[in-house]
Design a protein with these regions (language model features):
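C-terminal substrate-binding subdomain of Rossmann-fold SDR/epimerase-dehydratase oxidoreductases
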Residues: 3-4, 175-322
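Residues in well-ordered alpha-helical elements
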Residues: 34-35, 47, 59, 66, ...
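Residue-level signature of the cytosolic catalytic core of signaling kinases
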Residues: 7, 20, 29, 33, ...
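NAD(P)-dependent short-chain dehydrogenase/reductase
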Residues: 104-109, 113, 121, 127-210, ...
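Residues that form or immediately flank small-molecule/cofactor binding pockets and catalytic motifs
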Residues: 31, 97, 115, 155, ...
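N-terminal Rossmann-like NAD(P)+-binding domain of SDR-like oxidoreductases, especially those catalyzing
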Residues: 1-153, 312, 322
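Short acidic donor-binding/metal-coordinating loop in glycosyltransferase active sites
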Residues: 65, 97, 153, 159, ...
């Protein structure tokens, strides 16, 4: 496995905690640097490419829209160009976001054929990333021995996320400091899921379409409808699971626009690939709290991480070939 990314953006960072630079072929490269990207592709000759690199935060995209578009749009152009010029690649998966859709605040989930038009610079840049991939597919990839898919995942949670302005990392930060968790949009609904759900799907899809191009396409990946909860509900679950007097309160939010209601219809992935979510949102919170407490109690976090991955993969065996 070869990974291309920037240096970890947080201290601490899961990449450093697990010493992944000692376990995989890790290249610290900006995906906007096409020449450096081409050199890695020339050397490695990859067969399966999964594109997850991004500026991933809505609030940061308001602060720095040019950088966001540069990374998320031109970065995708560069990845597509590397894929186009390397015949070794047989399977390509571009990971975007559930926020690519034109949000109409519907009470039902968006389907893969609904209109794309993200509102904020982050969401819109990811809509653009989809259009770039579609154009490259129509113009170039369709003439190659290459399967191309796009995946739109809901909000991910899990141990090891230390990013700012994300609900569960904020919950952990406030709680370990014995402070009340401040929630800016408690009534907003999001398709929260454990990070292992979409990541496993990307790997599974990359493998399946490598052997069967007919499976290539666009897929939503999110929780079952019963697990689409409000931010207030998921914070409440966190507090109930963490215990130790964990509590939260709503705070006034005067920041830039964020969607209030967002759900995904994942029927296509369930039907075409026999996929289904493994862990409920309650399970996801329990795993996240377990990981976080283990980390702050100075336990062997690599063992904890591997244990959770293996528990998940054992359950995944029911529908996959992993």
């Amino acid at each position: 496995v070869t990974g291309i990314a920037l240096k970890p953006a947080t201290i601490p960072a899961l990449f450093d905690i697990l010493k992944l630079d000692e376990k995989i072929d890790s290249r610290i490269i900006d995906i906007r640097d096409l020449d450096s990207m081409m050199k890695v592709f020339d050397e490695v000759q990859p067969e399966i490419v999964i594109h997850m690199a991004a500026q991933p935060l809505v609030i940061d995209s308001y602060k720095n829209p040019v950088y966001t578009y540069d990374v998320n749009v031109m970065g995708t152009v560069n990845i597509c160009e590397c894929v186009r010029t390397h015949s070794s690649v047989k399977s390509f998966v571009n990971v975007t976001t559930d926020k690519v859709y034109k949000n109409k605040e519907w009470v039902y989930g968006y389907r893969e054929n609904d209109r794309l038009n993200g509102y904020d610079p982050y969401s819109n840049s990811k809509s653009c990333s989809e259009l770039v991939t579609d154009s490259y597919t129509n113009s170039f990839f369709n003439t190659l021995d290459l399967a191309v898919s796009r995946c739109r995942a809901g909000n991910v949670i899990g141990g090891g996320d230390f990013s700012g302005n994300r609900i569960i990392p904020d919950c952990v930060k406030y709680t370990i400091n014995n402070e009340s968790i401040q929630v800016r949009n408690p009534n907003s609904t999001r398709p929260y899921q454990h990070v292992l759900e979409p990541v496993t799907f990307y790997l599974y899809l990359g493998m399946k379409q490598y052997n069967n191009k007919d499976l290539a396409g666009t897929y939503n990946i999110g929780p079952n409808e019963s697990d689409c909860v409000t931010t207030g509900q998921i914070v409440g679950l966190f507090c109930d699971t963490w215990k130790e007097d964990a509590n939260w309160s709503a705070t006034d939010y005067n920041g830039p626009h964020e969607a209030n209601f967002l759900k995904l219809d994942c029927s296509k992935a369930k039907s075409s690939l026999n996929w289904h979510p493994i862990w409920s949102v309650k399970d996801a919170i329990e795993k996240t709290v377990d990981w976080s407490k283990s980390y702050y109690n100075n336990e062997n976090i690599e063992e904890v991480t591997n244990k959770q991955i293996n528990e998940y993969l054992k359950e995944v065996e029911s529908w996959s070939q992993f």
